[in-house]
Every structure is written in C-alpha cells, then in structure tokens.
Amino acid sequence: MNFKHCMIRTVIACGITISLAAQAQDGAALYASKACLACHGADANTPTTNITPKLAGQNKAYLIQQLKDFKSGARNNGQSAQMAGIMGNVSEEEIEAIAEYLSGL
C-alpha cells in the first residue's frame, strides 16, 4: 500500500469519526427536544417510573430496532401506545442519531 492510499484511508476514517460525533451531539439535542427525558430521565439512566427502561449504554442496533418497532406498531406492550405517539414525529435519521447518542452514554 502506498502513502496516497494510506492517507485516503486516514481521511475517510477521520470523516466517519467526526460524523458519528456530530450524530451523537444531534442525538443529545433530539433526546431533549423529543421529550425522551420526561420519562427516561435527563441522563437516560433515571426513569420516572419502574416500568420505563433505562436507555443509557444500550446497544445501538437494539435501540434502533425498538424505536422502529414502536413507530411501526410492531411492538405493542407496556408503554407502546405512548411511545407510538411520540415516535410518529421522529424520522429514521433522528432514530439513528438518538440511538448513537444513547449507546455512547
């Protein structure tokens, strides 16, 4: 591998890292603006009820799937009616950003 290829890979890796950091920052803002903190806590680790899950540090792929399932209606247990209403106003891109943020806590 020559120097040029090495530099290209480095630039791409840096871009991905910066993109994920920006996505996580956006996720923090979305977590607040979409009112997630009202039930899951400001730190996503102190829910307001004993049936509300802690979200901090959860696996990103798991979070994405659960949020998509709430949005589509595939998940219909517990607080699913409330979550379905909230998720109706959350885009696929926002789901990704919120999941990135929560998984990094």
Question: What are these language model-derived features?
Answer:
Residues T48-A56, K71-L105:
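Axial heme c-ligation environment in periplasmic c-type cytochrome domains
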